[in-house]
């Protein structure tokens, strides 16, 4: 049975983990790093993912970053005449993660637990599941990031009853969850968050400040220059990280742009105090969901035993200070904020596989679910923070006489009016027998599975006719689209592999041409001109094949040249052997001649007494 890997598919970075010997371990990427940038780039038809893609982002406009912010929307990005959905871009990242996880584990990986922000709605969860499918992964479970973090943190503390608050500030999303841990049960009590707030926003306030200051000095708006913007983004991210450890940092961007007088440079000192001032609104925005999570759980800050930080942005000192002030305690530093979510996902994979025993995870739905009823209001069937999986049903009736069909408008959100909430889907129940309004009995049932994905059913209790829908938002992908993307992803994987093989073959051919020249030079007059000529012409044929780009020809000509070079080397070896034998023969003769000069002598023993 293949292992289930745990993937934290992040906005800025992603991480993958697997259970090994009863413990979750992080799988390093090919560069040896424990997290990989969630960046995809396209260059001359080739796809680049992770570190490589991020490194060349400044010079390559065909680079996609922070795609997670667009999951579950109809956003598309156009690269080299082709449009990509967020699901496809995420699938490219997942394919990359899957490939290096397979190299590490040593076997094919087909199943995964993928984490999402707790505040992801149904469309965003479905999009994540689709991305996994396109990448060739069966997504066994979608779990909330704060829940995964609590699982990784609390797995060795099962005997202690604790109420913990998980503060998760990632690259593009923010969540707070409160969990009760005890006797191996992890129960989410409440969750709150903001899907449009994260580390990227902290970078942006630094970028805006740099643009503003530069404009003041030079009357040039750097935000209109694409390459300058990418350099500013990298500098802002670095400054943000530096200011977590030092109180001020130098930002230096030479040749950022050119003015009438020539090239211009950006030089600036950024203090931690200035950064705190610029980002104070963002920090305060994280406090509102924190208070909401506490009030939803009917808890006060004194009821919280531990505060766990998740996400790289929680390293910002102002964030830690705000948490300490709000909750009256220092957050726990016992877990790595970049890795803890992936570790928790791997533990959940272990639970599903049966490797981790006596652990029960009770998650909640982050938003209320209901339908639109008369007067365009939302009637809730499942309240937010309800433990999942769950189901609920309610009976409704018709709004007009002789109404033969009802439209079921499925909604997710906390607002009273239907138009203010998120539409998850619509479907129709038809063939209702004509009757006065209020007479027909229509039962509407909601089911939420463990992944947080919703099924809705409407049934006419009079005729037992029913209609159901698995919610896929208007921005979601149809099964046909997912299948097409799966096929494309597989083809791309094959194409990438073929491209890699071509590069390897070209490198081997170039190396062989170099070796041939060296061998011919070393042999000099030790082999016949005819043999040398054969090798030279085989080498020229290989060069021509390389220029033509026909890989079949390159392979054939490479094999032919290898044969010639081996023959030349063999002749050289024979010659060296002959010379060695000849030399040892001459040495033998010489020593024989030396023996002829030896004088035989008789020895007689001399007695000491005779000498006297």
Swiss-Prot record:
Q: Which residues form the signal peptide?
A: none
Instruction: Give start-end positions of Low complexity composition bias.
Output: 574-586
**Where in the sequence does UniProt note compositional bias of the Basic and acidic residues kind?**
524-544
Give the Gene Ontology MF terms in alphabetical order: ATP binding; ATP-dependent protein folding chaperone; unfolded protein binding
Alphabetically list the UniProt keywords: ATP-binding, Chaperone, Nucleotide-binding, Phosphoprotein, Stress response
Bias (Acidic residues) occurs at 587-612
Q: Which residues carry this modification: Phosphothreonine?
A: 173
The UniProt induction remark is:
By stress conditions e.g. heat shock.
In this chain, the stretch annotated as Disordered covers 524-560, 572-612
Q: Which Pfam families match?
A: HSP70 (PF00012)
Q: Which family does the record assign?
A: Belongs to the heat shock protein 70 family.
The job of this chain, per UniProt, is described as:
Acts as a chaperone.
UniProt-listed PANTHER family:
HEAT SHOCK PROTEIN 70KDA (PTHR19375)
Q: Which NCBIfam families match?
A: PRK00290.1 (NF001413), prok_dnaK (TIGR02350)
* Protein known as: Chaperone protein DnaK
Q: Which organism is it from?
A: Oceanobacillus iheyensis (strain DSM 14371 / CIP 107618 / JCM 11309 / KCTC 3954 / HTE831)
The organism that produces this protein has a lineage beginning with: Bacteria, Bacillati, Bacillota, Bacilli, Bacillales
């Amino acid at each position: 049975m293949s292992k289930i890997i745990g993937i934290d598919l992040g906005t800025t970075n992603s991480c993958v983990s697997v259970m090994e010997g009863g413990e979750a371990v992080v799988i390093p990427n090919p560069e040896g790093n424990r997290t990989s940038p969630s960046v995809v780039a396209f260059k001359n038809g080739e796809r680049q993912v992770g570190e490589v893609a991020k490194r060349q982002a400044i010079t390559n406009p065909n680079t996609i970053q922070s795609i997670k912010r667009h999951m579950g929307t109809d956003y598309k990005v156009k690269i080299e005449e082709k449009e990509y959905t967020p699901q496809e871009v995420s699938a490219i990242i997942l394919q990359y993660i899957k490939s290096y996880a397979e190299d590490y584990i040593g076997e094919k990986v087909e199943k995964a637990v993928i984490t999402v922000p707790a505040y992801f709605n149904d469309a965003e969860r479905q999009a994540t599941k689709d991305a996994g499918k396109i990448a060739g992964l069966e997504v066994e479970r979608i779990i909330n990031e704060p829940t995964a973090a609590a699982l990784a943190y609390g797995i060795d503390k099962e005997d202690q009853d604790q109420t913990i608050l998980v503060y998760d500030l990632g690259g593009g999303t923010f969540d707070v969850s409160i969990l009760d841990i005890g006797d191996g049960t992890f129960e989410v009590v409440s969750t709150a968050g903001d899907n449009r707030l994260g580390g990227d926003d902290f970078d942006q306030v630094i970028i805006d400040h740099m643009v503003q200051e530069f404009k003041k000095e030079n009357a040039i708006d750097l935000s209109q220059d694409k390459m300058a913007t990418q350099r500013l983004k990298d500098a802002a991210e670095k400054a943000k990280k530096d200011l977590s450890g030092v109180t001020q940092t130098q930002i230096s961007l030479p040749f950022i742009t050119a003015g009438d007088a020539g090239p211009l440079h950006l030089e600036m000192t950024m203090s931690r105090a200035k950064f705190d001032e610029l980002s104070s609104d963002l920090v305060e925005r994280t406090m509102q969901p924190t208070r909401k999570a506490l009030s939803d759980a009917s808890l006060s800050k004194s009821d919280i035993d531990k505060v766990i930080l998740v996400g790289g942005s929680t390293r910002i000192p102002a964030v830690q200070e705000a948490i300490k002030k709000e909750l009256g305690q220092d957050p726990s530093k016992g877990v790595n904020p970049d890795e803890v979510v992936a570790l928790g996902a791997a533990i959940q994979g272990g639970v599903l596989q049966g490797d981790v025993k006596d652990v029960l995870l009770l998650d909640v739905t982050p938003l209320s679910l209901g339908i639109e009823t008369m007067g365009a209001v939302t009637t809730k069937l499942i309240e937010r923070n309800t433990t999942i999986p769950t189901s609920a049903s309610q009976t409704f009736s018709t709004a007009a006489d002789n109404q033969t069909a009802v439209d079921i408008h499925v909604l997710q959100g906390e607002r009273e009016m239907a138009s203010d909430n998120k539409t998850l889907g619509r479907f129709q129940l038809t063939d209702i027998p004509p009757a006065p309004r209020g007479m027909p009995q229509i039962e509407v049932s909601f089911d939420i599975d463990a992944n947080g994905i919703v099924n809705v059913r409407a049934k006419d209790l009079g005729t037992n006719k029913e209609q159901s829908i698995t919610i896929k938002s208007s921005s979601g992908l149809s099964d046909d689209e997912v299948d097409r993307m799966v096929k494309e992803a597989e083809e791309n994987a094959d194409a990438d592999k073929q491209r890699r093989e071509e590069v390897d073959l070209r490198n081997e051919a170039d190396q062989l041409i170099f070796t041939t020249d060296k061998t011919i030079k070393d042999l000099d007059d030790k082999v016949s001109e005819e043999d040398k000529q054969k090798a030279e012409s085989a080498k020229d044929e290989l060069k021509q094949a390389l220029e033509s780009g026909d890989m079949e020809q390159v392979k054939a000509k490479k094999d032919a040249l290898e044969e010639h070079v081996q023959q030349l080397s063999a002749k050289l070896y024979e010659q060296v052997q002959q010379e060695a034998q000849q030399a040892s023969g001459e040495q033998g003769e010489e020593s024989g001649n030396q023996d002829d000069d030896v004088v035989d002598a008789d020895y007689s023993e001399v007695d000491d007494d005779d000498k006297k």
